[in-house]
């Protein structure tokens, strides 16, 4: 079974997380998300993550680490989440989407796609947010 691989960056700065308003698609209408996108053919995850975040939020990633992978059999997708803690450049929405820096505890006030609920729960357990 062939999967579509998607890389997602969780950008962390001083106990806040960067979120963007999801694109207007039928399955993500009025939702928030972490920036990222599809892995292109012949790209590895690291290259895709750096490319996607440069394209979407204008940053050059300097420090990151793998966080979680979630596989969705029914949609045939794999979501690869990375924690980004250091970068170069000023973060903004290059694609014109609404964005916010929010505290981890405030994530509960925003609607996210269902796969993110596991990620948000795991983030809340992490020491560097305490």
Curated annotation (Swiss-Prot):
<dbReference type="Pfam" id="PF00293">
    <property type="entry name" value="NUDIX"/>
</dbReference>
<comment type="function">
    <text>Specifically hydrolyzes both 8-oxo-deoxyguanosine triphosphate (8-oxo-dGTP) and 8-oxo-guanosine triphosphate (8-oxo-GTP) to the related monophosphates, thereby cleaning up the nucleotide pools and preventing misincorporation of 8-oxoGua into DNA and RNA. It prevents replicational errors by removing an oxidatively damaged form of guanine (8-oxo-dGTP) from DNA and the nucleotide pool. 8-oxo-dGTP can be inserted opposite dA and dC residues of template DNA with almost equal efficiency thus leading to A.T to G.C transversions.</text>
</comment>
<dbReference type="InterPro" id="IPR000086">
    <property type="entry name" value="NUDIX_hydrolase_dom"/>
</dbReference>
<feature type="short sequence motif" description="Nudix box">
    <location>
        <begin position="37"/>
        <end position="58"/>
    </location>
</feature>
<dbReference type="InterPro" id="IPR015797">
    <property type="entry name" value="NUDIX_hydrolase-like_dom_sf"/>
</dbReference>
<dbReference type="GO" id="GO:0044715">
    <property type="term" value="F:8-oxo-dGDP phosphatase activity"/>
</dbReference>
<comment type="similarity">
    <text>Belongs to the Nudix hydrolase family.</text>
</comment>
<dbReference type="GO" id="GO:0006281">
    <property type="term" value="P:DNA repair"/>
</dbReference>
<dbReference type="GO" id="GO:0046872">
    <property type="term" value="F:metal ion binding"/>
</dbReference>
<feature type="binding site">
    <location>
        <position position="56"/>
    </location>
    <ligand>
        <name>Mg(2+)</name>
    </ligand>
</feature>
<keyword id="KW-0378">Hydrolase</keyword>
<keyword id="KW-0235">DNA replication</keyword>
<dbReference type="GO" id="GO:0006260">
    <property type="term" value="P:DNA replication"/>
</dbReference>
<dbReference type="InterPro" id="IPR047127">
    <property type="entry name" value="MutT-like"/>
</dbReference>
<keyword id="KW-0234">DNA repair</keyword>
<keyword id="KW-0479">Metal-binding</keyword>
<feature type="domain" description="Nudix hydrolase">
    <location>
        <begin position="1"/>
        <end position="128"/>
    </location>
</feature>
<dbReference type="InterPro" id="IPR020476">
    <property type="entry name" value="Nudix_hydrolase"/>
</dbReference>
<dbReference type="GO" id="GO:0044716">
    <property type="term" value="F:8-oxo-GDP phosphatase activity"/>
</dbReference>
<dbReference type="GO" id="GO:0008413">
    <property type="term" value="F:8-oxo-7,8-dihydroguanosine triphosphate pyrophosphatase activity"/>
</dbReference>
<keyword id="KW-0515">Mutator protein</keyword>
<protein>
    <recommendedName>
        <fullName>8-oxo-dGTP diphosphatase</fullName>
        <ecNumber>3.6.1.55</ecNumber>
    </recommendedName>
</protein>
<keyword id="KW-0227">DNA damage</keyword>
<dbReference type="GO" id="GO:0035539">
    <property type="term" value="F:8-oxo-7,8-dihydrodeoxyguanosine triphosphate pyrophosphatase activity"/>
</dbReference>
<keyword id="KW-0460">Magnesium</keyword>
<feature type="binding site">
    <location>
        <position position="36"/>
    </location>
    <ligand>
        <name>Mg(2+)</name>
    </ligand>
</feature>
């Amino acid at each position: 079974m062939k999967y579509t691989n998607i890389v997602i960056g969780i950008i962390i700065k001083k106990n806040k997380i960067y979120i963007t308003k999801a694109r207007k698609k039928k399955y993500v209408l009025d939702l928030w998300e972490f920036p990222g996108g599809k892995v292109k053919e012949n790209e590895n995850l690291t290259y895709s993550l750096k490319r996607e975040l440069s394209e979407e939020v204008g940053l050059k990633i300097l420090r990151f680490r793998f966080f979680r992978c979630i596989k969705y059999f029914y949609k045939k997708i794999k979501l690869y989440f990375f924690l980004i803690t250091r970068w170069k450049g000023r973060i903004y929405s290059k694609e014109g989407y609404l964005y916010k820096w929010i505290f981890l505890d405030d994530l509960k006030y925003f609607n996210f796609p269902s796969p993110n609920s596991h990620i948000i729960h795991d983030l809340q357990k992490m020491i560097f947010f305490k």
